């Protein structure tokens, strides 16, 4: 009965030991155990009662069962294994005295060392061994996290650098697999559309970041109007084509821009021509709307300065087509005449439409002068200095400065369209020559 009570009390006593006290208790005993087994057992029995706890040694001096249990190495492990089934956590803290009292080989790697140091061991193992694993995970996280700014810089680099990523030279052209569910002929037409607009409006040797923002935006809007299914890749296509042009220039290749045969076809050329025609009509319509709005904001006044400006426009080699004639009220000599504005001297190469000559019939001297101006322009398609001097006294409908600037923008647009169509014709001719 007393043995069981002391054995049950023993784990609580051993669990009260701190790890530092246990190590101090075990280190001299391990040294004694390496010298000889008899001295270790004697010192273990003596030190076991004295170093475990002073209170326990004083309270157990009269009982002969406790020294026998501590002195005998065979009884202690049996009792401890039975106690280990009851309280495994306290057992691990309690076993160091048993290992100190046991044999010389077992205490160094006993359950006490694993009990007290198992947590420390695993804690220490996680500290020295986890840095390689954690550093590996940190490195992977670092590369993933730092990959974002690095990829962003790579994404920004083509805007500032000429040839940063050489792999996407003709990425949009050659990647027909990306256009699943889309018409490949329209994709070819879209690529040629972008190429032509870039050739006419941008400097091909300048990166997209240094190009005028309004021109880039205008090309993107044109692409979205004519090819709405490819509007997301318009900017990327512009950037890729500019890079390929710079690369060709760097490699000393000819910049005549021959279209590769696999990137064009007759159907794609037809789609391209229809898109260009539609875009030209829409641009002309926008210009006419701007002119009409500006003419309503500022009434037309007869002035010599305006006549000089219109005479300067007369010498332009390009003229407005018949579709540019718009119907708006014209204030001349104080009378309101609702007639076609013929832009008199502007149409130097085109005959005015039949509706223009019939629409000018109104009352008043102003109508006669406007009719005379229209007939003068119809009879003199290419004005010479003599004809200009003779037609100067004839009063014509004048334009405001805002209208003149808008007309000049329209003229520039038609020039670009004409050059664009000329390039398209050259490319078609080259395509026919290449196939034949």
From Swiss-Prot:
The lineage's top-level taxon is Eukaryota
Q: Which GO terms describe its cellular component?
A: cytosol; nucleoplasm
Q: Report whether Ribonucleoprotein shows up as a keyword of the record.
A: no
- Region ranges (Disordered): 1-184, 351-400
- What keywords are assigned to this protein? Phosphoprotein
| Basic and acidic residues bias (residue ranges) | 170-184
Q: Where is the composition biased (Low complexity)?
A: 41-61, 375-396
State the InterPro entries in the record.
Answer: HTH_NOL4 (IPR056549), NOL4/NOL4L (IPR039788)
Residues recorded as bearing Phosphoserine in the entry: 130, 295
List, as start-end ranges, the regions of compositional bias called Polar residues: 351-366
Q: State where composition is biased (Acidic residues).
A: 160-169
Please identify the protein, giving its name as recorded. Answer: Nucleolar protein 4-like
Native species:
Homo sapiens (Human)
Query: What are the leading ranks of the lineage?
Result: Eukaryota, Metazoa, Chordata, Craniata, Vertebrata
Report which gene this protein is encoded by.
NOL4L
